[in-house]
Amino acid sequence: MNFGLFFLNFQPEGMTSEMVLDNMVDTVALVDKDDYHFKRVLVSEHHFSKNGIIGEPLTAISFLLGLTKRIEIGSLNQVITTHHPVRIGEQTGLLDQMSYGRFVLGLSDCVNDFEMDFFKRKRSSQQQQFEACYEILNEALTTNYCQADDDFFNFPRISVNPHCISEVKQYILASSMGVVEWAARKGLPLTYRWSDSLAEKEKYYQRYLAVAKENNIDVSNIDHQFPLLVNINENRRIARDEVREYIQSYVSEAYPTDPNIELRVEELIEQHAVGKVDEYYDSTMHAVKVTGSKNLLLSFESMKNKDDVTKLINMFNQKIKDNLIK
C-alpha cells in the first residue's frame, strides 16, 4: 500500500484564496522532507465556484514540482474533454523533463454539465470526445508525435515538444460507468471520486474486473487510487461538523439530481476517516479492499486547526514508517 495526499482546495467561508493555497504549499513542503514517506501529492481541477479554486492544476503542479525534490506531484483529475489534448501533451512533456520523472498524470472526463456547456462541448458525444482526446494525448506521450482525423480533431502529424523522458504514470477518474469500462479495456488504473459512496465505488470496481477479464487484461499490478477525507478529533462531533461544513456545497453542486443531498453528505461522513482516532481504521481497510485500491490518498483540508493537521500527518507518517520497517 502506498500513501499520498490530495488537495481539493475548497475556499470555505472566512478563508481567502491565498490562505487556501498557502495551506497546500506548506503541507506539500512538509511531506517532501526526507523523513516523510508519502509517495505523491495530487491536485484537483475545478471551475467557476469556490468548491475548488484551481481551474488549471498543471500550473499549480509546476510550482509544487519546483518547490519539492523527492515526492511525486500530479493531477487528480486533469479534464481532457474540455481541453486540447496536444496542449496537455506539451505541458506533460515539459513537466516530466523538468521534474526528472516526478510528474503523475491523472485524467478525467468532464463531470459537470455546466462546464461542458461553457467550453462549448456537446454533451451528446461526451464519451466519444473524451476517448478521442485520450488517444491523441497518449500517442503524443508514448511516441512523441501525434495526428488526428476524426469527428472532433483534424491535424497532420506533429512533434509534441519537449518529448517525455520517462513513461508518465496515468490514472483515470472513475467519473461514469462508461469511462470505467473504457479504462478497464485499456488496463488503466482508476482514481475513485471521493464524493461517490462506497457502494458506487465498489460497483465500478466489480464492473472494471468483469470488463478487464473479457478483454484478457491482467489486473494484478493495476494500482487503483482511493481518496479519503481525514478529520480526526478527540471530540467526534467537531470532526463531523467540520467535514459537513466543508463538503456540503460541493456535494450539492456535483450531484444536482440527488433528491437527498443531506443523506449523501452524512453517508460520506460515515465512510471517510472522520471522528476519533480509533474509529477509522477498519472501515478504511474494508473500503480499500472492496475497491481493489493500492494507493490511499489523504486530504486533511476540512480540519480547521492546522497544528492538529501537522500532528495527524506525523502520526500517519510514523505508521507508514513502522510498516516499512516490518
Curated annotation (Swiss-Prot):
Reactions performed catalytically: a long-chain fatty aldehyde + FMNH2 + O2 = a long-chain fatty acid + hnu + FMN + H2O + 2 H(+)
CDD domains (UniProt xref): Alkanal_monooxygenase
Oxidoreductase listed as a keyword: yes
Entry GO CC: cytosol
Keyword Lyase in annotation: no
Protein family (similarity comment): Belongs to the bacterial luciferase oxidoreductase family.
Name of the protein in question: Alkanal monooxygenase beta chain
Source organism of the structure: Photobacterium leiognathi
